[in-house]
Structures are given as C-alpha cells and as structure tokens.
Amino acid sequence: DKVTCDFMNTSWNGLCMEDQRFQAVSIPMKNTRMTLVLPGKGVSFDQISSTESIREILELCDPECTKWKQGLVKLSLPKLQFQSDMDLIPMLQEMGIRDAFQEEKADFGCIWQENGKETSEPDLYVSQARQAGAVKVDENGCSVASYTEITIKESMMIPDIKMKMKCNRPFIMILSDDQGTPLFAGAVSRIE
C-alpha cells in the first residue's frame, strides 16, 4: 500500500556509501550523527537486517570506518515520529537473570540500607522492568527521549499477628522524619 506523506529535502557535501545491498548516509549533528541505511533496489529489508548485515551496518557508526566516501548527498526523508515501550524481563531472563524476578529467590541484601546502615533486608524482588523511547525527526532536527524503569517490590509474608483498625472515632496522627523526630502531631476529634 502506498501512503502519501511530506518529505524533507536537503543536500550537503558529506559522508555516503553505496553497494549492491544498501545505500547509507551519515548526517552530522551537534555532538552526534545520524546514520540512515536504505536497502538497495530489489533488496528486502529482511536481507539487510540479518545479524551479519547489522554488524556491518553498525561498523558505519565508527568514526574511523573507511567505507565512507565524501560526496554530494541529496536526501529526501519523511518526517518521523515513533515510540516504543518494551518489557525487559523476558530479554533479561534470556540473558540468564532469573532469580531477581522471583520473590523467594531474589537477593538484594547488598543494596538494602535503612537510615544509612545495612540491615536485614525485606524480601525484595523485581516486579517490572521496562524501557520506553521516542524519536522525532523534522525540519528542526532530531530529538530522542528514553527511560528505563525497574520496579522493586517487597513480597508480603503473612504475619502471625492480625489486626483490624477502623478509625471511626477520635484518633491521633503523628508525622515524623526518618530519625523519629515528630514534625506534626494532631488529633482528629470529629469525622464529618
């Protein structure tokens, strides 16, 4: 299916390369560069996205790569904007990191501190690991944002003591800092 879209057009004297499999250009930017790789005519995207081809394409990102030639580059590029959101747990498990995600096997004792002192840690485990990113390319340049979020939860052991507390009559409330110093104290005498 063909889609109609606006293209940004530019030309400059810069780095480019071409062989039977693909064309590539290197676009200089402030403190970085963008490399664009386009499959050659009659070459499928799958052919240039094989592991071997990707290794060769990644070599183009090396500033010392000798495959680049200096030339007049005329580029037509559509405006781009896309986002991704990926669950990292399956990939991390495939890399051999498994115990961190299991309540009964995770061991984060080496990083657990309370009030600046090592203590016996609660049962912590990684409940979520995500990475999200966004890329936007337009006339103003390229902007990229990315973040990784790892959520660590405390597994709940069912305690021997059970208590039910319903604050439906006057009660006292005290807010204190982590040193135990009261910051605010008050009494709730009437609930409306």
PLM-predicted stretches and their roles:
Residues 1-192:
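Hydrophobic-core positions in well-structured secondary-structure elements of globular domains
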